[in-house]
């Protein structure tokens, strides 16, 4: 709402795209910012670099941001939740799992699903292996399922080597240094 803040942030976006030719933006807690700002942001960024990728972090259904005037994609946390609830935590039976996955796909048109950013862990979540109780078989099944889904799969650093780590209650062990 503050015009000076808005102008500053748009200038930052312009600077990074023009000066450093970045390929995309990952926008944290993106649903906390006014839609009109994101429309201006997209017009500016795409005006400089039409193929610059704009990814928003929204933890719930986000169709209002995916109508072609704000983001190109979202982090697909509804699918994340369905997969981790079933494979890692064992919270759902098969029918509940199928229903949760189906709901995550029915929330969007096919072209949007094809661009969704599918993930099983991030800097904001407990790592998958920890959710699985360090059962690598469960983690592998969860990744296998994710990799077979429509959308773009993403592995949070360390997931590929089985890093663990809890998130919450003041712990940030999900952000520990990479095992090299």
Predicted region positions:
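Short catalytic-loop micro-motif centered on adjacent basic/acidic residues
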Residues: 24-30, 129
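Active-site-proximal helices and loops of the catalytic beta/alpha 8
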Residues: 18, 28-111, 116, 135-136, ...
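Active-site-adjacent "subsite" loops/lids of carbohydrate-active enzymes
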Residues: 1-20, 30
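Substrate-binding cleft of secreted/luminal carbohydrate-active enzymes
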Residues: 143-146, 150-164
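Aromatic/hydrophobic pocket-lining residues that form the small-molecule binding cavity
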Residues: 9, 38, 139
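Short, solvent-exposed helix-loop connector elements
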Residues: 128-134
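Loop/turn elements at helix/coil->beta-strand transitions in domains of secreted/extracellular proteins
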Residues: 21-24, 49-52, 150-154
């Amino acid at each position: 709402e503050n015009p000076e803040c808005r102008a500053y942030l748009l200038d930052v976006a312009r600077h990074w795209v023009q000066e450093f030719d970045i390929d995309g933006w990952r926008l944290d807690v993106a649903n906390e910012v006014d839609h009109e700002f994101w429309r201006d942001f997209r017009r500016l960024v795409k005006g400089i670099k039409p193929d610059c990728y704009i990814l928003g972090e929204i933890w719930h259904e986000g169709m209002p941001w995916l109508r072609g005037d704000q983001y190109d994609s979202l982090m697909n946390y509804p699918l994340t939740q369905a997969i981790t609830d079933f494979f890692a935590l064992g919270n759902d039976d098969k029918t509940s799992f199928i229903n949760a996955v189906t709901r995550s796909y029915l929330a969007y048109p096919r072209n949007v699903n094809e661009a969704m950013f599918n993930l099983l862990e991030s800097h904001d979540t407990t790592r998958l292996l920890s959710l699985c109780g360090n059962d690598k078989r469960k983690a592998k099944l969860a990744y296998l399922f994710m990799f077979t889904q429509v959308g773009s799969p993403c592995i949070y650093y360390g997931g590929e080597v089985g890093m663990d780590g809890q998130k919450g209650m003041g712990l940030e062990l999900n952000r520990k240094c990479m095992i090299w």
